[in-house]
């Protein structure tokens, strides 16, 4: 082998790797690959771990929001369930009839939840609502990052709530006793209060228990809200101190100011003098002095005087005797501010000039001669120019209102005793007319009639009252919101202040069950407030029968009206020779006659009556309106739909006194007043009062009386005497008995034919069987049996009380 071959061989060995080195290199590459793959796996695991850590925070926020909303919804559901709790709903604590409609707003489940809560804890169950609200508020602030390092401890709050729901019912039971038994399952405090309270009272006594319970409740409330009472008191003290400092600074600043007798450039002394003189100025034109810039006469200003009220805030100084009826006092009503209506004569002058200029734009020449301002409107009296017709001015009422930017303008074509016309404009600021102003006025106090009613104030601010005995009936109409119901309430309240139950009695018919039901139970009522229209027909039938009875009594006594009858009865009793009842059920020993009260029938909504019992109601109202005045029976009929099918010609012809509040159309105004104008009123008590024999109505602002005032007066009246109802008035029995007393011929009874048929078919002649069959009272059944005897249907009763049937079907 040569040297070259050795070199090639060595080179070849050196250039080609050996199998062992190749295997080692492959192993190294595999190890490096494993490490890379392990690193990649570690990175992926780390990413997964970070993703898992980040995802729960977002999910937790969503879950927290959902739980917060669910808690809010549950709290609101619990609130409406507790508010609408009704003892008549199905419940867990007591049995109740099966009802289809559950009154609870939360449904059947809400009714059970509210019942269980009130049964266990009484009113203290509302602490659960308070705790839920506190927890929701705290969690909301914490979640919204509005608080730093603040965490609401729910465990402490739960413990505080537990203590509250145990101790609060005990306090409720001790303070309220067994009250609210009608509105709560077991009364105030629930079963927890009753049971735990008994243990506390036995161990610590009532006084000691109250002291400990109050301390525990304060601590529990502090833990529930998680506030410190000391910090709260310190904060309240600082707030009061800051407020006092601010007030003292204002007082010192006011003290440094110089007194100024003039305000805003107006001489207050001169203004007082002008207002004082304006009150005494009559509505007569006053000529302007020569050289005035205007040829128009100056406006004579008539200002509504301030209400002068003299009210006794306490009861009468005389000692009150037991059983004596006392009329309500004015301290039960709200007393208004005795501030006069602010009138600016310059403003009246500007308005008068504006009226003249606006009418001149329409080609109408007028001259304003005077102005009268009242609580709601101001009337400007105008003299039309020569050749101008009043109808031309009346036709421009809407155009004048639009040009003056007013809600409405009412034009009075004729003013009694004057050759002027009236333009009534609404005031910028309304003045409330309270019922107490009218009742405290001399015109009401000096009125002798027991049926004096407060109507309101006229355009000059003068109180206006009416005598229902002279009207003698009143028809009231007005749309919703016009003040009709308030006006009727004011009339009823006026009579309650004026008369006792022995002098005036009421029959109230309230189809809406809202307006007059507040008077239910007063001693002036002859029957409960009528809400069923069928019973309303029976009540009117009784009134007609009572009217006929009274006319018989008046005729027998030889007098012309109820007032004369009562005077004669009183005089005979004073002379020791009382008048005897000529229609007594015991003719051998008749009872003496007593004074008869006047009766006022109040119908709140005539439209409902006419829809249900049209013929009977229309005839009965017409009969009462025609004849009932002398018998002392009067009516106040109200409706919010004065259409011709409700206020018929028969009713209108017999009720000449009308009072119209705001109505919807000119047709309604013509229906109620026989003229237009009620459609242009301003609502809220603005009305037109048409008296008998008067062609032009009087514009009034009705007296306002609130529900609270009515409640106070009704409660006072109920304390004076209990309700005294006429038995059977709403069933028709009282009317029939009254008719039988006046006319003993009971065969006029509408059930006479049915009684004859029943006796002939059943062969039963006892009064009790007739009473059961016809479903009537015993007295009426006895009268029917006597009528059957007089008609020859049955024989007189024998010694055993039985009767024989004398007639047969063939003979009838």
UniProtKB/Swiss-Prot annotation:
UniProt keyword terms in alphabetical order: ATP-binding, Cell cycle, Cell division, Cell inner membrane, Cell membrane, Chromosome partition, DNA-binding, Membrane, Nucleotide-binding, Transmembrane, Transmembrane helix
Gene Ontology CC: plasma membrane
Record-annotated FtsK domain positions: 461-670
Stretches assigned to the Cytoplasmic side: 231-812
Membrane topology listed for this record: Multi-pass membrane protein
Claim: Kinase is one of the keywords in the record: no
Main location: membrane
CDD domains on file: TrwB_TraG_TraD_VirD4 (cd01127)
UniProt GO molecular function: ATP binding; DNA binding
Positions of region (Disordered): 1-36
Pfam families: FtsK_4TM, FtsK_alpha, FtsK_gamma, FtsK_SpoIIIE
Bias (Basic residues) ranges: 1-11
Organism superkingdom: Bacteria
InterPro entries: FtsK/SpoIIIE/SftA, FtsK_4TM, FtsK_alpha, FtsK_dom, Ftsk_gamma, P-loop_NTPase, WH-like_DNA-bd_sf, WH_DNA-bd_sf
Chain positions recorded as ATP binding sites: 481-486
Residues annotated as transmembrane: 63-83, 116-136, 156-176, 184-204, 210-230
Record field: compositional bias (Basic and acidic residues): 25-36
Intracellular or extracellular location(s): Cell inner membrane
Single GO biological process annotation from the record: chromosome segregation
Subunit structure: Homohexamer. Forms a ring that surrounds DNA.
PANTHER family to which the protein is assigned, alphabetical: DNA TRANSLOCASE FTSK (PTHR22683:SF41), SPORULATION PROTEIN RELATED (PTHR22683)
Function: Essential cell division protein that coordinates cell division and chromosome segregation. The N-terminus is involved in assembly of the cell-division machinery. The C-terminus functions as a DNA motor that moves dsDNA in an ATP-dependent manner towards the dif recombination site, which is located within the replication terminus region. Translocation stops specifically at Xer-dif sites, where FtsK interacts with the Xer recombinase, allowing activation of chromosome unlinking by recombination. FtsK orienting polar sequences (KOPS) guide the direction of DNA translocation.
Family to which the UniProt record says this protein belongs: Belongs to the FtsK/SpoIIIE/SftA family.
The record's note on its domains: Consists of an N-terminal domain, which is sufficient for the localization to the septal ring and is required for cell division, followed by a linker domain, and a C-terminal domain, which forms the translocation motor involved in chromosome segregation. The C-terminal domain can be further subdivided into alpha, beta and gamma subdomains. The alpha and beta subdomains multimerise to produce a hexameric ring, contain the nucleotide binding motif and form the DNA pump.
Protein name according to UniProt: DNA translocase FtsK 1
Gene name of the record: ftsK1
């Amino acid at each position: 082998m040569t040297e070259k071959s050795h070199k090639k061989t060595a080179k070849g060995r050196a250039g080609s790797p050996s199998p062992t080195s190749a295997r080692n290199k492959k192993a190294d590459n595999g190890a490096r690959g494993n490490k890379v793959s392990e690193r990649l796996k570690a990175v992926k695991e780390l990413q997964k771990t970070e993703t898992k850590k980040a995802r729960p925070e977002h999910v937790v926020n969503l879950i927290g929001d959902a739980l917060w909303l669910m808690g809010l919804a549950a709290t609101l559901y619990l609130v409406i369930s507790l508010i609408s709790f009704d003892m008549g709903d199905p419940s867990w604590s007591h049995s109740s009839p099966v009802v289809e409609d559950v009154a609870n707003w939360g449904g059947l489940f809400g009714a059970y939840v509210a019942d269980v809560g009130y049964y266990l804890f009484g009113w203290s169950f509302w602490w659960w609502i308070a705790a839920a609200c506190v927890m929701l508020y705290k969690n909301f602030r914490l979640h919204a990052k509005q608080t730093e390092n603040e965490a609401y401890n729910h465990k402490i709050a739960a413990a505080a709530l537990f203590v509250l729901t145990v101790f609060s019912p005990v306090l409720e039971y001790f303070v309220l006793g067994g009250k609210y038994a009608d509105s709560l399952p077991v009364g105030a405090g629930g079963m927890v209060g009753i049971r735990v309270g008994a243990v506390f009272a036995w161990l610590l006594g009532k006084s000691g228990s109250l002291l400990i319970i109050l301390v525990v409740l304060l601590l529990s409330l502090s833990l529930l809200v998680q506030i410190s009472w000391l910090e709260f008191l310190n904060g309240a003290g600082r707030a009061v101190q800051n407020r006092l400092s601010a007030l003292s600074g204002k007082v010192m600043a006011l003290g440094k100011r110089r007194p100024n007798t003039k305000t805003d450039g107006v001489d207050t002394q001169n203004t007082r003098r002008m207002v004082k003189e304006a009150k005494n100025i009559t509505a007569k034109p006053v000529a302007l002095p020569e050289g005035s810039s205007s040829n128009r006469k100056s406006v004579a200003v008539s200002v509504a005087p301030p209400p002068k009220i003299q009210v006794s805030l306490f009861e009468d100084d005389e000692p009150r005797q037991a059983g004596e009826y006392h009329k309500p006092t004015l301290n039960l009503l709200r007393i208004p501010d005795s501030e006069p209506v602010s009138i600016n004569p310059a403003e009246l002058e500007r308005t008068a000039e504006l009226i003249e200029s606006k009418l001149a734009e329409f080609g109408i020449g007028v001259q304003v001669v005077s102005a009268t301002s009242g609580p709601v409107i101001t009337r400007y009296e105008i003299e039309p120019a020569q050749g101008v017709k009043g109808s031309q001015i009346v036709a421009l009422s809407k155009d004048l209102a639009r040009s003056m930017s007013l809600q409405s303008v009412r034009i009075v074509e004729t003013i009694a005793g004057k050759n002027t016309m009236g333009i009534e404009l609404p005031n910028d600021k309304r003045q409330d007319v309270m019922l107490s102003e009218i009742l405290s006025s001399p015109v009401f106090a000096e009125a002798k009639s027991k049926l004096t009613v407060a109507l309101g104030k006229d355009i000059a601010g003068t109180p206006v009252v009416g005598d229902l005995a002279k009207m003698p009936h009143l028809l009231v109409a007005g749309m919703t919101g016009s003040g009709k119901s308030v006006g009727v309430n004011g009339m009823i309240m006026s009579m309650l202040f004026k008369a006792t139950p022995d002098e005036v009695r009421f029959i109230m018919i309230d189809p809406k069950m809202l307006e007059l039901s507040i008077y239910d139970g007063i001693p002036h009522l002859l029957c409960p407030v009528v809400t069923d229209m069928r019973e309303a027909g029976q009540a009117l039938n009784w009134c007609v029968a009572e009217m006929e009875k009274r006319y018989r009594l008046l005729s027998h006594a030889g007098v012309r009206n109820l007032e004369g009858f009562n005077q004669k009865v009183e005089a005979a009793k004073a002379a020791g020779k009382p008048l005897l009842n000529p229609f007594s059920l015991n003719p051998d020993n008749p009872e003496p006659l007593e004074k008869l009260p006047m009766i006022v029938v109040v119908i709140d909504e005539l439209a409902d009556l006419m829809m249900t019992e049209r013929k009977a109601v229309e005839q009965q109202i017409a009969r009462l309106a025609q004849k009932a005045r002398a018998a002392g029976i009067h009516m106040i009929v109200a409706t919010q739909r004065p259409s011709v099918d409700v206020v018929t010609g028969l009713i209108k012809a017999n009720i000449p006194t009308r009072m119209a509040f705001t109505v919807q159309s000119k047709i309604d105004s013509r229906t109620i007043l026989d003229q237009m104008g009620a459609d242009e009123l301003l609502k809220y008590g603005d009305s037109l009062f048409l008296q008998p024999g008067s062609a032009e109505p009087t514009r009034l602002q009705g007296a306002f009386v609130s529900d609270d005032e009515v409640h106070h007066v009704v409660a006072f009246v109920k304390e004076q005497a209990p309700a005294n109802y006429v038995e059977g008035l709403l069933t028709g029995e009282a009317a029939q008995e009254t008719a039988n007393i006046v006319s003993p011929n009971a065969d006029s009874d509408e059930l006479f034919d049915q009684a004859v048929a029943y006796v002939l078919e059943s062969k039963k002649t006892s009064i009790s069987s007739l009473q059961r069959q016809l479903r009537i009272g015993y007295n009426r059944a006895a009268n029917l049996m006597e009528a059957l005897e007089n008609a020859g249907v049955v024989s007189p009763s024998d010694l055993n009380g039985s009767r024989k049937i004398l007639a047969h079907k063939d003979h009838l």
